[in-house]
Amino acid sequence: MSSCKTTLSEMVGSVTKDRGTINVKARTRSSNVTFKPPVTHDMVRSLFDPTLKKSLLEKCIALAIISNFFICYWVFQRFGLQFTKYFFLVQYLFWRIAYNLGIGLVLHYQSHYETLTNCAKTHAIFSKIPHNKDANSNFSTNSNSFSEKFWNFIRKFCQYEIRSKMPKEYDLFAYPEEINVWLIFRQFVDLILMQDFVTYIIYVYLSIPYSWVQIFNWRSLLGVILILFNIWVKLDAHRVVKDYAWYWGDFFFLEESELIFDGVFNISPHPMYSIGYLGYYGLSLICNDYKVLLVSVFGHYSQFLFLKYVENPHIERTYGDGTDSDSQMNSRIDDLISKENYDYSRPLINMGLSFNNFNKLRFTDYFTIGTVAALMLGAIMNARFINLNYLFITVFVTKLVSWLFISTILYKQSQSKWFTRLFLENGYTQVYSYEQWQFIYNYYLVLTYTLMIIYTGLQIWSNFSNINNSQLIFGLILVALQTWCDKETRLAISDFGWFYGDFFLSNYISTRKLTSQGIYRYLNHPEAVLGVVGVWGTVLMTNFAVTNIILAVLWTLTNFILVKFIETPHVNKIYGKTKRVSGVGKTLLGLKPLRQVSDIVNRIENIIIKSLVDESKNSNGGAELLPKNYQDNKEWNILIQEAMDSVATRLSPYCELKIENEQIETNFVLPTPVTLNWKMPIELYNGDDWIGLYKVIDTRADREKTRVGSGGHWSATSKDSYMNHGLRHKESVTEIKATEKYVQGKVTFDTSLLYFENGIYEFRYHSGNSHKVLLISTPFEISLPVLNTTTPELFEKDLTEFLTKVNVLKDGKFRPLGNKFFGMDSLKQLIKNSIGVELSSEYMRRVNGDAHIISHRAWDIKQTLDSLA
């Protein structure tokens, strides 16, 4: 109902102890005069508690309030129900305007210019009246001036009013004018606020249906719950802020006391103006009259205008804007992105019925707005011909598929920076990838909500005769609530948080701390709670249509899954797994029954976890029963190697196929060549025998015959064989000689014959011009080198040296024609193996294979990804 409750609730809370029991000090706003405020009481006690002294104005106010009921009875008997309703409706509108506009103007001028205080000082309203009146004195009553007579009357009346109201020990002249002005101001506030409340209640009472059937239903039950909750909000708010805030005390003077957040002020921003008006809607539900609901909406909306144009400006001038370094972090990140990337511009964002940050030079903005315009115009022009069943399927499928797409991007981005890598490897920047994501996400929101609006609008239009006006208005209120939630969320976390910036630009985060400002002070995940209430509002607007219920469930589930299983794990990874209790959670846990339930749940959870841990320990104990050798990886590998050697060669003493230095080296790092020694009995040797190189995983199925092609990775055993294949075999066959019993030789597989893929390989010796296997070598490993990535210069040096040895570098540019086995994919794999990043083939072709550009680009990507880790 009043201001400083918002002032202190939003900015610093308020004292929770009674003013009379603690030593509260106050000071005037301009002169800084300190004083101890007197004990005051709340509005209801001041007016109706018979044990308290009553001033003349308080008695008049109480009589005016009570007279409303007699007037209501008389007007009802004389003019009937409808006239009486409108009579009190007009009264309510008058007092509501007097509240929001009248009190608003008074407080506005008091806040800016201390108008009431200066007026009291100028006319000495709270100064002592001398007994010997001087003709030149301000207190002279000899003058016939109406002005002086008027101010003399005001002076006497105000002093009499305060003396009759306050205890005898209250010294009127010992206090500064500010406190006395405030005490008089309270009287007029009591009149306006009580009249506003009583006339509204009478109007509502006259609007309640006479039929018991219309009263006793689910709407009335929900209405009573809202009213009871509203009463608790009012009582708890007054418990926290006391009279000082209830009557806008900080417009007159400032209290110096310990200020804390408590109770209802942990549940909602501006609780007296937000959830403090839920009783209005509870009464509207009981009445089931859309006219009452519209009046309630008017009263509530005018209160928000009062908050926006009177209280909030005063709050910011008196206490600051309430933001700290943590709450401004995301905003600073947005500024930093714009500063470091001259071609970056703020993304287009849809907020309700408007678009923010429209860029006339950005095509995607036209595309987004054009999509909305096309869908809306198409729906309006073809409303009669649209099949609602098909439209429902379209909305459902569009929402589900687009959500899966969005969720997949976020999940893969969180796990491996997939989306950023996709753009980096194609030559774009990290920020450019973020810009594309911003378009995708905003377009997803715009498209799905536009389709939902169209479908709901057509549902209402096609079945308007069955739509309940109250339900329609309540639905619009829920839509407005979701729109407000979105705006508050964006205000709290800025564009960076709205577009999941910590998924894409975590290297821009300087402080690993989640914001607890704005709406996040009350809810940990407002988008999961209030971010779908507008969709449920469409259920009300369409009179609980089954299709709208299905869509609302879909929206709710997808929102919940995204927050629970993608956003929350990522937030824990970036900011640490800290348990942050929301304001609502603190308040609920402060209630003793709920706190007891929470303790029971925690104890049960601890018991379950302990039992699972004990069971896990028992099951792990079975591993000790295994032989120790089987737990030793090195010995296990030796056993596997011996088993493979046992089938690698024939029993003949002259059958041999061995890799040189295989006892020393089983892992060949490219471009190191692999030399093979072979021996074959002379009676088995054929001049067309050949040796092929294969991946073990491809040939493991058959040890007698090779059933896969060598892909060119083969060599003859004799220089004179396979002459039609050019000089390749003359270079690979380095030695061959024959004796009476056997033939032996050496074959070297260099970069012109080797694979450029990491893996386990083997050589196979084939008989004649066939694929019959005579000998199989010991498996060995081929791996790409790990280049030096300490600096971009060293990385470029190692890369160019390797490409030169592989014969694919010419004039500093990659030319795969020099080696048919080392193509674009091999180069990509080499870079990925060395530096952990991948460049696309398209990008490398775009830069014409320039080794300098490729190496430096890969190194830059590595630095970017490292900064995101």
Swiss-Prot record:
One of its GO terms (biological process) is methylation. Pathway: Phospholipid metabolism; phosphatidylcholine biosynthesis. It is an enzyme of class 2 (transferase). It catalyses: a 1,2-diacyl-sn-glycero-3-phosphoethanolamine + S-adenosyl-L-methionine = a 1,2-diacyl-sn-glycero-3-phospho-N-methylethanolamine + S-adenosyl-L-homocysteine + H(+). This is Phosphatidylethanolamine N-methyltransferase. PROSITE patterns: SAM_CHO2. The modification N-acetylserine is found at S2. One of its GO terms (cellular component) is endoplasmic reticulum membrane. Catalyzes the first step of the methylation pathway of phosphatidylcholine biosynthesis, the SAM-dependent methylation of phosphatidylethanolamine (PE) to phosphatidylmonomethylethanolamine (PMME). PANTHER family: PHOSPHATIDYLETHANOLAMINE N-METHYLTRANSFERASE. Its EC number is 2.1.1.17. InterPro entries: Phopholipid_MeTrfase, Phosphatid-EA_MeTrfase_fun. Pfam families: PEMT. It is a multi-pass membrane protein. The keyword RNA-binding does not apply. It comes from Saccharomyces cerevisiae (strain YJM789). The chain crosses the membrane at residues 56-76, 87-107, 188-208, 213-233, 259-279, 292-310, 363-383, 390-410, 440-460, 464-484, 535-555. It is found in: Endoplasmic reticulum membrane. One of its GO terms (molecular function) is phosphatidylethanolamine N-methyltransferase activity. Belongs to the class VI-like SAM-binding methyltransferase superfamily. CHO2 family. Residues 77-86, 209-212, 280-291, 384-389, 461-463, 556-869 are cytoplasmic.
